[in-house]
Amino acid sequence: MANQKIRIRLKAFDHNILDQSAEKIVETAKNTGAKVAGPVPLPTEKDVVTILRATHKYKDSREQFEIRTHKRLIDILSPSPKTVDALMRLDLPAGVDIEIKL
């Protein structure tokens, strides 16, 4: 695994949990001797939903709700088998979605 890199994308609705998870991953990778680039904040997706407040009429009265998806990118350069093993055992919060590419 000398010339490979691991690219980790994290997604979450809460940016505090996301930053804590990214910090755990960076700390774990650095403890095993790998070089780390990141966490890089990626653009936040904003999903807006507009609904009518009334059930049958009054179309002018509407309400908008939004949900923001925060994203981070971490590159682990020259990972060792020890790094991969440590990352597989890492326990992260339930609200964080993780995508890993080799």
UniProtKB/Swiss-Prot annotation:
GO terms for biological process: translation. Gene3D superfamilies: Ribosomal protein S10 domain. InterPro entries: Ribosomal_uS10, Ribosomal_uS10_CS, Ribosomal_uS10_dom, Ribosomal_uS10_dom_sf. GO terms for molecular function: structural constituent of ribosome; tRNA binding. The keyword Nucleus does not apply. Keywords: Ribonucleoprotein, Ribosomal protein. PROSITE patterns: RIBOSOMAL_S10. Pfam families: Ribosomal_S10. GO terms for cellular component: ribonucleoprotein complex; ribosome. Belongs to the universal ribosomal protein uS10 family. HAMAP family: Ribosomal_uS10. Involved in the binding of tRNA to the ribosomes. Part of the 30S ribosomal subunit. This is Small ribosomal subunit protein uS10. It comes from Clostridium novyi (strain NT). The gene is rpsJ.
